[in-house]
């Protein structure tokens, strides 16, 4: 917003605003490309929302996301994160769909049933034919997701240009879809805009399987299973699982779901170490007041202390609304662009609950060797849809859908000896809760614990301490507008070449010298690092 002159002579080729994981990835690649880079992080530690924090004496937990789902092994290897301290637990991370009164269903990351009702025997129906149909359609969904994988990795093309890079990206995407063959291509076109409720009811018999896949389709979004476009978000998640495997030196190979030792903060620390080793500098506890603009070009930043740091290029890891409307200012943008940014849907709908436990909880029908996996409370599609219905009216459900991990099962160092941590992502927790969060925070936390108690009798008696992070808390603590972990809703109209808005969908912005690299860019949230890498490539002038 400032147009003042440089104050103290500090100058870099690139300044990255925000030391979240995407900002750190961006800084590492820029430094490797020969640029002088400074990362400015307002918090006292790097990582943004990908940090490990102590929430009770001796108990540490990943503050937001608690598993790596879509970070590619190729990127982990390319940045040599293993050499910078990143390691993963040995546990083969599976998804376990819990049942309150029966046997749970165990799934692989791409939806393949590997145990429980629907595994081997029959998609919940007790027939070999049912199992065959179940596996056949899952294979189809994964083929469709694999065809969409290049969309996740690449820079979205611009429409209406003759630039070879844009034309090549469109041709590559068209070729990937064409390679599916007539049947699969027709199916992709048929189901792409459907709701996941109808798709799963048409093709699977097991309520647990339907519920688990439906939950994955809407996790972290403002959608329910019956919402149009929720098949697309399921394919998006499956595409991340397809894209994730690769040879890595710091853990097991080819696993889409990974639990880092030390929590997600270990990923951020390794990224910071890699960036510094490449030549980047990082300053924590340093908040940016505004982006300096001179001659209609980003020329640096002004800190809240008044210090001005000049740069040829400014890359913002901050969410798009905060970048354009607060740090830059609408006076440097045309009215149409400003309106599109203002209308971005950015209100979060997921909460995070942390429990410090005096013992390991036992879940109904679950053997102890399965407790180190990802556990889901989403017993049916109707259950998830009913939870979503309340959120539309600014309310929370008495029966929320929940993703649970017990990170201390695989990483005992996160809690005192013999104690455990439970980390839960809860759908749905409206940002604009009717009558506000302050008076209802305890009630919501109690509902979540009571819901888990139905699947893990005795859980409540083992709770030593509780921490709830509702969307307004995420907004305040991690400076994310609306507390949305994707920085902006992930939906058809806010994806790919429309993300965050036309005119800024290729990481470049309407202001020369200003780029975006955060989760509000393509391909969205989750600890992937793709947006940071692609933004760096754009700055360096390399083809993604």
Task: Write out the residue ranges for each language-model feature.
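N-terminal glycine-rich phosphate/pyrophosphate-binding loop and immediately adjacent elements
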Residues: 7-162, 487
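Mid-domain catalytic core of redox enzymes
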Residues: 10, 259-261, 287-415
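Extreme N-terminal leader/targeting segments of oxidoreductases
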Residues: 1-14, 32-33, 495-497, 501-502, ...
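Conserved FAD/dinucleotide-binding core of flavoprotein oxidoreductases
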Residues: 113-122, 265, 321-326, 356-358, ...
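A conserved FAD-binding loop/helix module that cradles the flavin
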Residues: 65, 519-540
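Active-site/ligand-binding neighborhood in enzyme catalytic cores
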Residues: 145-278, 285, 480-495
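Flavin-binding catalytic cores
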Residues: 128, 360-361, 393-397, 437-476
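A glycine-rich dinucleotide-binding beta-alpha-beta segment and adjacent secondary-structure elements
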Residues: 206, 211-227, 378, 396-405, ...
